[in-house]
Swiss-Prot record:
SUBUNIT field: A and B can form homopolymers.
GO molecular function: structural constituent of cytoskeleton
Keywords: Coiled coil, Cytoplasm, Intermediate filament
Boundaries of every IF rod domain copy: 1-342
Gene3D superfamilies from the UniProt entry: 1.20.5.170, Lamin Tail domain, Single helix bin, Vasodilator-stimulated phosphoprotein
Region (Tail): 343-497
Cellular localisation: Cytoplasm
Homology family: Belongs to the intermediate filament family.
Protein name: Intermediate filament protein A
InterPro entries: IF_conserved, IF_rod_dom, Intermed_filament_ifa/ifb, Lamin_tail_dom, Lamin_tail_dom_sf
Keyword Cytoplasm: yes
GO annotation, cellular component aspect: cytoplasm; intermediate filament; nuclear envelope; nuclear lamina
Top-level taxon: Eukaryota
Length: 497
């Protein structure tokens, strides 16, 4: 940019120098009119250095233009690459969002399962508490049964002692009765009457039998009662102990099964908790990646905006350079025309003023002809979009339209090009339907019979008119389909003697 500005400043200085030279030459022209054609060779030699410098300047400008075009193409390629990467990043961002939604759904399902398992664990804990309570109750009953067993054992010992006491008492009573019987027998033996002895003996034997029978009956009854009661108590204790053992075994088995299930569920829950922690860590990492990604996108957007601004500045500079190239080309053609003629016919002075922000170009030229007439021509261009009127031939042979945008096509089908000559005559040309003007391209519209070839989209031929017209005040206006003015080109010429 600085180099181009330096070159532009140098060019402006050169133009000013040429202005001074032209003024000097204009003063010398009056002297040359009287002796026209005498000093042609000397004048040509005098301007040969100027022509060489102009050619060198044109070559340098063309070379700089090619370098700028290469740089712009490189920037456009980089911009396309950044756009592609940006689109890839957007697609990756969408995939990450879908993955986050899927993980969130899985997390919701896992949280629901965890809540369900927590409720089941609470129910199992309540069941364990109930079983422990029942076990405590069974233990209390077992303790009571053992206490009853001990009491019954003590009762049995007491009854055995009572039996022993009764047996001893029976034995004592037997001895007493035997002694009484012996005494009665002794008394009976002292009885001398055989009938009395026999009678007492029989009575005594009968009494003894009755006593023995009664004693045996009492002993049998007591023994049977004791045995039945003892067997009943033992059976009850055994039955109760067996039932308690069965219940305890069943409770133990059920607790073992529940404990195994709880251990399995606990391991499952630990695995799920580990998975949840990993998911949470992945979410945190994903959020960090998203923040980094958004920061990178913001940086990239800032770089893209900066590149767009630089690209726009370069395009504005390129437009200015193209305008200068066009003016230099005109100047070169005029100078080359001087080389091809026999004498000095005309001197040309051009001053270019470009306003890139308003998209209005003004060009003013002064033409001094042989004889007594001087012609001054000024050009003014403006555009309200990407399509502008780049050039109009002063003799009305052609009109050039250009798309200044570097990447956007412009559909200008059925647009109208109106050309007004000196406020009187008006020529209207309608562009073909569905005509597309490509980015950075131009189309030259030739009048009929002016050497143009109809080869869209580079060249078109206006078959209805032989010329677009020429005059001292020519306005060329481009309208869109809706009749809105999109671009203008104004040419004003004045002649002085």
């Amino acid at each position: 940019m600085s180099d181009l500005n330096d070159r532009l400043a140098s060019y402006i200085e050169k133009v000013r120098f040429l202005e001074a030279q032209n003024r000097k030459l204009a003063a010398d022209l009056d002297l040359l009119r009287g002796r026209w054609g005498k000093d042609t060779l000397s004048v040509r030699a005098m301007y040969e250095g100027e022509l060489q410098e102009a050619r060198k300047l044109v070559n340098d400008t063309n070379r700089q233009r090619e370098e700028l075009e290469k740089e712009i193409r490189k920037l456009l390629d980089e911009l396309s690459e950044y756009r592609r990467k940006y689109e890839d990043a957007l697609r990756g961002h969408q995939i990450d969002r879908d993955r986050i939604d899927e993980l969130l759904n899985q997390l919701s399902g896992l949280e629901a399962e965890i809540n369900l398992l927590r409720r089941r664990i609470a129910n199992i804990i309540e069941e364990i508490a109930r079983i422990k309570k029942e076990n405590l109750q069974f233990a209390n009953e077992l303790t009571k049964a053992r206490s009853d067993l001990d009491q019954e054992t003590l009762n049995r010992i007491d009854f055995q002692n009572q039996v022993q006491t009764l047996l001893e008492e029976i034995d004592f009573m037997r001895r007493v009765h035997d002694q009484e019987i012996a005494e009665l027998q002794a008394m009976a033996s002292r009885d001398t009457t055989p009938e009395n002895r026999e009678y007492f003996k029989n009575e005594l034997a009968s009494a003894i039998r009755d006593i023995r029978a009664e004693y045996d009956q009492i002993c049998n009854v007591n023994r049977m009662d004791m045995e039945s009661w003892y067997k009943l108590k033992v059976q009850e204790i055994q039955t109760q102990s067996t039932r308690q053992n069965l219940e305890q075994n069943y409770a133990k088995k059920r607790l073992r099964v529940q404990l195994t299930d709880l251990r399995g569920k606990l391991a499952d829950l630990e695995g799920r908790n580990s998975l949840l922690k990993q998911t949470q860590e992945l979410n945190y990492q994903l959020e960090d990646d998203q923040r980094s990604y958004e920061a990178a996108l913001n940086d990239r957007d800032a770089q893209i905006r900066k590149m767009d601004e630089e690209c726009q500045a370069l395009m504005m500079l390129l437009d200015t350079k193209q305008t200068l190239d066009a003016e230099i080309a005109i100047y070169r053609k005029m100078l080359e025309g001087e080389e091809n003629r026999a004498g000095l016919r005309q001197l040309v002075e051009q001053v270019v003023k470009t306003h890139g922000l308003t998209q209005v170009d003004e060009t003013e030229s002064l033409r001094v002809l042989k004889g007594e007439t001087a012609s001054r021509t000024s050009f003014q261009r403006s555009a309200k979009g990407n399509v502008s009127i780049q050039e109009t031939a002063p003799d009305g042979r052609y009109v050039v339209l250009e798309n200044t945008h570097r990447s956007k096509e412009e559909a200008i089908g059925e647009w109208k090009l109106k050309r007004k000559i000196d406020g009187k005559r008006e020529i209207v040309y309608t562009l073909p339907r569905d005509f597309i003007l490509r980015p950075g391209k131009s189309v030259k519209i030739w009048a009929r019979g002016q050497g143009g070839i109809h080869s869209p989209p580079e060249q078109l031929v206006f078959d209805l008119e032989d010329t677009f017209g020429s005059g001292s005040n020519v306005q060329t206006i481009l309208f869109n389909r809706e009749g809105e003015e999109r671009a203008t080109h104004i040419q004003r010429s004045s002649h002085t003697i």
